[in-house]
Amino acid sequence: MARIIRRPLNLTAAVRFRLSPLSPFSGNSGSINSETTSWSELIRVPSLVEGCDYKHWLVLMKPPNGYPTRNHIVQSFVETLAMALGSEEEAKRSIYSVSTKYYYAFGCRIHEPLTYKIRSLPDVKWVLPDSFIVDGDNRYGGEPFVDGEVVPYDEKYHADWLRDQTDEDAKSGVVKKKHRRKRKKKLI
């Protein structure tokens, strides 16, 4: 799932490539009379993302302005989902995880048609089907949100994401620069 979060266009490209009736190398020029698949008619691709049930969704948000507290970020997630569901209580019951440190997102249990409404809300970047961290293990990523409250922060909730991030950096040969403070020259 972490790979989808970092590169959501890979998911889109894979779906489009797999469902596209026209190949860039085919002899079909895509004339007016040719049939094309409209985006509203796309079917699910179950083998694309394992562990997806299309009942659990990951809503990725734009980063907040300034430096709000963790509780303010979580409250903004609840308010965003409440716009779609109609009440904050319903939103709190629906949310099962949040992420407030490495990326801004929340996981929620909703029906698929509601995702279209959520996508149109302010500050929502993407709505993606959520999947288990480990196939067969009914555990989703992020910090658990239980009974309307987020559990105290612990780095273990992002261990898989951090490991994937480190693996991706190693594969791509990215060497991260350490920031250094500029030293002031002493005037003599």
Curated annotation (Swiss-Prot):
Subcellular location: Mitochondrion
GO biological process, one term: mRNA processing
InterPro entries attached to this UniProt entry: MORF/ORRM1/DAG-like, MORF/ORRM1/DAG-like_MORF
Pfam families, per database record: MORF_dom
Basic residues composition-biased segments: 174-188
A GO-annotated cellular component: mitochondrion
Keyword Isomerase: no
Region (Disordered): 169-188
Transit peptide: 1-20
Chief place where the protein resides: mitochondrion
Keywords on record: Mitochondrion, mRNA processing, Transit peptide
Subunit-level organization: Heterodimers with MORF8/RIP1, MORF5/RIP5 and MORF6/RIP6.
Family the entry assigns: Belongs to the MORF family.
Stated role: Involved in organellar RNA editing. Required for the processing of few RNA editing sites in mitochondria.
Protein name, as recorded: Multiple organellar RNA editing factor 7, mitochondrial
